[in-house]
Amino acid sequence: MAIADNKKARFNYTIEEQFEAGMVLEGWEVKAIRAGQVQLTDGYVVVKDGELFLIGCRINPLRTASTHVHPQADRTKKLLMKKDEIRRLVGKVEQKGYTLVPLNLHYKGGRVKADIALAKGKDLHDKRETEKKRDWEREKGQLMRHKISSPRKDT
């Protein structure tokens, strides 16, 4: 079950490969995520010293958060993956045009995981083409529903 989806990622990028990564979170962040107070749209993944970090993922703290903890909504979160997977990602990201973007957050075995994708940015004409295809699929579905639901007139 997805907690939060980054719908803009699929529109702005061409997804090449998907990976699953664990996240290092604080207690107040887990509570806020369970309450649905998370936003991924501005998030991106960077590589520093052979480690992956999720930047721009906004987790809004709950009002009931403890007073001795000072929550930061835009805190950088470390992502956990196997070393060989990270090395492979670093090699791909160093190629021109590739980037790492978060696709969604979900639960797996009671833990919060992030799906990240190796992606290439789309050009403006690619975005327009995607929009045209989506509109055509929607229109086609409406036509088929209308055709099936209306009775046939034979005279």
UniProtKB/Swiss-Prot annotation:
Q: Name a single GO biological process.
A: trans-translation
Q: What does this protein do?
A: Required for rescue of stalled ribosomes mediated by trans-translation. Binds to transfer-messenger RNA (tmRNA), required for stable association of tmRNA with ribosomes. tmRNA and SmpB together mimic tRNA shape, replacing the anticodon stem-loop with SmpB. tmRNA is encoded by the ssrA gene; the 2 termini fold to resemble tRNA(Ala) and it encodes a 'tag peptide', a short internal open reading frame. During trans-translation Ala-aminoacylated tmRNA acts like a tRNA, entering the A-site of stalled ribosomes, displacing the stalled mRNA.
Question: Where does the UniProt annotation place the signal sequence?
Answer: none
Q: Where is the composition biased (Basic and acidic residues)?
A: 123-142
Question: Does the keyword field hold Hydrolase?
Answer: no
Designated name of the protein: SsrA-binding protein
Where along the chain is composition biased (Basic residues)?
143-155
**Entry-linked CDD domains:** SmpB (cd09294)
Looking up PROSITE patterns in the UniProt record yields:
SSRP
List the residue ranges of the region (Disordered): 123-155
Alphabetized, the UniProt keywords read: Cytoplasm, RNA-binding
Where would you say this protein principally sits, based on its record?
A: cytoplasm
Q: Which GO terms describe its cellular component?
A: cytosol
What family classification does the UniProt entry report for this protein?
A: Belongs to the SmpB family.
Tell me if Cell wall biogenesis/degradation is a UniProt keyword of this record.
no
The protein's matches in NCBIfam families, at most eight in alphabetical order, are given as: PRK05422.1 (NF003843), smpB (TIGR00086)
Annotated transmembrane regions: none
Q: Which GO terms fall under molecular function for this chain's record? A: RNA binding
